[in-house]
């Protein structure tokens, strides 16, 4: 379980960091290397989920989406300096609960 969580966190950070670098390049006129580094980071993000032990691609990506939401809220707060409100946190917690059900519910 800890490896799965670690891979989800690593994928999330790679996706958000890569997207953020591309954002800075295109929206805030940062140098081209921001965009290139962002693109490379996004490629790495695309590979990371393949190391998950779960057999279903769809389940892994759906569950990852919930983790991504939590990380995106945290990134916005810590890096972009946009304080999340109660509804941001409530929505993120609901998503995390859904992820837990999807991944670890007993199945027969």
Curated annotation (Swiss-Prot):
Superkingdom in the source lineage: Bacteria
**SUPFAM superfamilies linked to this entry:** Multidrug resistance efflux transporter EmrE
Location of this chain's protein in the cell = Cell membrane
Organism whose genome encodes this protein: Bacillus licheniformis (strain ATCC 14580 / DSM 13 / JCM 2505 / CCUG 7422 / NBRC 12200 / NCIMB 9375 / NCTC 10341 / NRRL NRS-1264 / Gibson 46)
Q: Which Pfam families match?
A: UPF0060
- Give the keywords, sorted: Cell membrane, Membrane, Transmembrane, Transmembrane helix
Protein family per UniProt: Belongs to the UPF0060 family.
| Gene Ontology terms: cellular component | plasma membrane
Principal localisation: membrane
Q: Does the keyword RNA-binding apply?
A: no
InterPro entries referenced in this protein's UniProt entry, alphabetically: UPF0060
What is the topology of this protein in the membrane according to its UniProt annotation?
Multi-pass membrane protein
Protein name in UniProt? UPF0060 membrane protein BLi00854/BL03049
Transmembrane segment boundaries: 3-23, 31-51, 60-80, 86-106
């Amino acid at each position: 379980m800890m490896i799965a969580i670690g891979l989800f966190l690593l994928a999330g950070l790679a996706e958000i960091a890569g997207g953020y670098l591309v954002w800075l390049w295109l929206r805030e006129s940062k140098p081209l290397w921001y965009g290139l580094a962002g693109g490379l980071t996004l490629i790495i993000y695309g590979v990371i989920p393949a190391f998950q032990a779960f057999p279903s691609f769809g389940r892994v990506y759906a569950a990852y989406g919930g983790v991504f939401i939590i990380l995106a809220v945290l990134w916005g707060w810590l890096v972009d300096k946009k304080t999340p409100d109660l509804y941001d946190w409530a929505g993120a917690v609901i998503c995390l609960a859904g992820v837990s059900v999807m991944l670890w519910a007993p199945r027969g």
